Amino acid sequence: MIRLVLYFCLIILFSCVDKHFIAYSIDGEKLNYEDLHTSSSGISDFKLFFNKDEIDLEYTILHFIATDYYYYGQFFFDKNFMSMLKNKTLHMGADALIYEKDRTDFPNYNENYLYFTAIKYKN
């Protein structure tokens, strides 16, 4: 019985969080996270980049992520926010994210959101 209650609590938690993280295709089409699950390149460390020049490996762009998920202070210091962002990134098969601070050309751009580019390293 306890497992059943815990299972439903997790479902409710993830369904509430999913609406705060929106995935878009490269073409700007809104995507469902359930449809995005793919395997990663085998690199197990999640990495957040603040500049494309920091990336040493070749990569391809998978998707874009937009979020209005609440965070304390600067988002990269908020452990809960970063944990959710990491889980979403790895779930979609990406190896890393690029924080897109100054890009306003994302689909349905909203200044209240943070935007990221999800990338996958080439093997």
Where are these regions (language model features)?
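Sec-dependent N-terminal signal peptides
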Residues: 4-13
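Solvent-exposed loop/turn segments at secondary-structure junctions
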Residues: 20-24, 69-73, 103-107
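Extracytoplasmic
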Residues: 43, 60-62, 94, 111-113
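Short acidic, glycine/proline-enriched helix-loop-strand junctions
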Residues: 76, 104-123
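Bacterial Sec signal peptide processing site at the extreme N-terminus
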Residues: 14-31
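A composition-biased, non-transmembrane "mature-region" signal
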Residues: 41-44, 48-51, 55-61, 79, ...
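Short, well-ordered alpha-helical segments
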Residues: 62-102
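Post-signal peptide N-terminal segment of mature Sec-exported envelope proteins
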Residues: 26-46
